[in-house]
Amino acid sequence: MSSLASPGRIARVFAALHARREVAFIPFITAGDPDLETTAEALLTLDRNGADLLELGLPYSDPLADGPTIQAAATRALARGTTPGAVLDLVARLTPELRAPLIVFTYFNLILAVGIEAFVERLAASGASGLLVPDLPVEEGDALQTAANVQGLDVIWLVAPTSPPERLRRIAERTTGFVYLVSTTGVTGARTQVASSVRTSLAQLRALTTRPVAVGFGISTPEQAHEVASLGADGVIVGSACVQLLATAAPEERLGQLAEFCRQLKKASQTLPVKS
């Protein structure tokens, strides 16, 4: 029997890390690629090798925020018949074993297909701790936010380098758990370097909110994780690189490689002391 989501779990993780002067490492993978059983094993592997929070993407046929790597993973998962219901069943089975809170990344049409309240209720019952919907503007998110609040789920909103100050303020006020700072314009995917705008965006958010800020999109190497942490981010999110590893590694080697990659990223993001 699955447990209801624990309100504030994500915030408590960040508070504990802050007290230890650590930065959160947050990996992302796509559910169902290459299959749901591997997804389960990958989540457990990440959880046991340094992940502080976990992001799990529901595969969707038109993932506008995602680059080629995650789009391809979603296509493969859908071709295997992966459904949101099957993924949430998997989450319910796994969350009692996970140390790290789990955040579900989904496009809004998948929520609308079953209804906002019904989706959020089932997500909370699965034991997930948060929800991230990249294609839902905060201005249109009242119904989702209200339903999530009732169920004790965090709703994490994204801000972009191009977001004007008033929009930054609105999102900083509305988000719970943490603010997701998109490091660059465009879609997800590995980049060769961290965008110079990250430092400026972090400073703008610091002036508006005391909530943790995690940086994602385009971070794919330990060196980049180190750089983002050194700029003062509270969390480092790595997605496409994890998805690519699961897609390309030999089946008998993928979990071992994922564990090592996770440890490297966690260690790299702690190399410099963070703010007191």
UniProtKB/Swiss-Prot annotation:
The keyword Lyase applies. Keywords: Amino-acid biosynthesis, Aromatic amino acid biosynthesis, Lyase, Tryptophan biosynthesis. Its EC number is 4.2.1.20. It catalyses: (1S,2R)-1-C-(indol-3-yl)glycerol 3-phosphate + L-serine = D-glyceraldehyde 3-phosphate + L-tryptophan + H2O. One of its GO terms (molecular function) is tryptophan synthase activity. It holds the Pfam family Trp_syntA. This is Tryptophan synthase alpha chain. GO terms for biological process: L-tryptophan biosynthetic process. The alpha subunit is responsible for the aldol cleavage of indoleglycerol phosphate to indole and glyceraldehyde 3-phosphate. Belongs to the TrpA family. PROSITE patterns: TRP_SYNTHASE_ALPHA. GO terms for cellular component: cytosol. Pathway: Amino-acid biosynthesis; L-tryptophan biosynthesis; L-tryptophan from chorismate: step 5/5.
